[in-house]
């Protein structure tokens, strides 16, 4: 066991001031929770989830939390955020109301429900702030235990900064690796696999992580006996306890109502983690939930009278009050005065937040009412329009929706009248303004977004031949990347010692060390989380998921956390993580999947790149490292030994993102595909040319973003026919591709035949060469599909094959 140092002694007067300050923060937080619930139940807010019953341990955590540290927590941590000075009473209520002004609700500008916290890591131009000079919180998400994988990466970043030299601007992100990543989770959520995966990984990596489990014995209405073996998470994690000459954890237990012991425990945990990079788990038990889980219900429904009586007695604020009286910190009357002032201050903050939320909406309401009355004066529908205006004007607390609904309904009435233009213009301007409030920042809006990367062609020697294994091009390009960007690192299953399963990292660990080129365990979700957390702290991680089929283990974190990060923080945080994987065709159900439809529909907010060969893939990595956005790069699993030309400008050539490439020009039909399937398309096109069919072949290269220059429709204007070839299931990625071409690019007007798709079968691909042939599109399938489309247009020239 590791012993903590003794802290310097405060005078009693200093101690008293500190305790009273803490108590004031706790009681303010409690009053916010109580009043917040009332605001929901009276209809002013939609939903509330609060931190009541967890206030006192969060005070202790805040005392140990230093500048540069990061929090990765969940929706109970309002007291902590108040204690570190990152949440005011008025901001608390602004979040509850969903105020779309980032100044009023700095957590998410109303995009997340209240209780989801974040600090701002970026300046207005998207550049990094000095994170060592502020207390940091990564942005919360609701999915239970979803904060855990990211926590691992936040902690690992400190280890990287402590041990890897030469990282540019490291001093803005770390003070020699002394930062702690602080995690919080409810006891019930420790049942999630993400919790155990993270706990195990942090124990292996030995990173400075302090994990607090807030234990009130319930998960919504479900008691711990249904959640946790032995009803005690620290008991069942005993095997992780660090012993001499082993890795592992320090595991501490403390009662959530014992203020003094909580302070001691958190100071001890911080010292262990900060100085020694040993993870610590603090099991904070005997906590309560005075209002139940959320505003959706009451805990009286599932707790008996004895439990409710115990919760009233051992409410952490009540116990802190009794302790303060017992040691003469304050008299009951003095504490009552603090309580009364807190109630008054919270009420005033609530009113200020509500007025700030409502005033701009009322201004828009009045502006529209005035406009409608003006239009009504000369309209054939004066009575109806006046009624709409009066009904809108009568709403005391209008919603933006109600304003726009009224305007749009009136527009229908006056579609043939002179007032239409001014109202339509008002609607368009209002919609544009408000849509930005709700829809901006899905992707980066800075000058370093992916569209800033300019195409740089590979440079080849005059006598270059296609005689180099594709994997060697990747290897040599990664070598150039690791030299050029000291902040880059790559990690994954088999990525280290053997240089990945396809030798694309051959020799890299030996050259750059085990921290920058690392093997990890079989745990895809936390591989992804490592990348998110380190990217949040200024590093440029490349997280390798060994096969595309295994991405499903990580897809929830990709979808819920990484993909939404810039959106849910309104561009105030970023994690430019590169996810490297390999997929499409190889062997059998579990090593030849191409679930692209699932992926692209789950990860909007992450770019999805599908290079056809390793030169294109290497170019994507080079492009992405100049940008500030996350991306998934899917290398072709069956392409590592295929021959390509060897470039001479490794680390410099760049594949443009969102730009298609025409591999073959033609006049009869446009064939659109990507990845491994393109080689079959090229083979089929060659055979089709022998029967007089001239195909144009387009490599998408990128699914998200999709053909930003709208070049595909230009091809269709020439060929008037379209076939999308995809090895995903029917209606998978091919449906998205078709929607983009037909709807977004308006290609329908140029088609002489119906657009068609050729996809894999609905089942997973079967094993073996024959299994592949009967599961996924073959060259013969492509030939016959194209031939049939041409037969439809000219049966005489192209007689039916069957």
Model-based region annotation:
Residues 55-59, 136-403, 637-802, ...:
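Thiamine diphosphate
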Residues 382-530, 535-537, 549:
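Non-catalytic terminal/interface segments that mediate subunit docking, oligomerization
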Residues 31-212, 217-219, 223-241, 246, ...:
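Cofactor-binding active-site loop characterized by glycine-rich and histidine/acidic residues
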Residues 573, 583-587, 591, 596, ...:
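Active-site phosphate/pyrophosphate-binding segments
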